[in-house]
């Protein structure tokens, strides 16, 4: 099912190639492993094509560390735009723009380079593999907005609807290719 609640060929393809891993990374979590989906050329083409339709009009695509990089780069290529890697804290040399956010147990940081890239006025779509609670995507949107960028939407391959990630991102439009 998509974010519109409809079964599509892309949603069915995602469902058929998503590996369910129980109790990972901790007990009670049902991890969605999209590696088989990304490794299948036809599926990757279908997924990036669908995400590119949601990202049209952007002049930059931002992917979140790390699986978001895989999809964002392919979407940017389709749209003939650049791609920006939003990194986990401590992975980039200074200076950086950073945004801290809370996790279930602790906190984390996202970073982008502070030099060499002018994001003021850029229309950016943020891409990631999975939307769960929305904390990471919300932090990415705040980070980009602080640099003067206009975040136009977020797009994900897989949404865990019961975790309420859309609410954390409101009023930002969120597009998911499949929702469970």
UniProtKB/Swiss-Prot annotation:
Predominantly, its location class is cytoplasm
Q: What class of enzyme is it?
A: transferase
Query: What residue range is the signal peptide?
Result: none
Report if keyword Glycosyltransferase is assigned: yes
The reaction(s) catalysed by this protein are: AMP + diphosphate = 5-phospho-alpha-D-ribose 1-diphosphate + adenine
Task: Quote the cellular component terms of the Gene Ontology held in the record.
Answer: cytoplasm
Q: Kindly indicate whether the keyword Glycosyltransferase belongs to this entry.
A: yes
- Which named protein is this? Adenine phosphoribosyltransferase
Q: Which gene encodes it?
A: apt
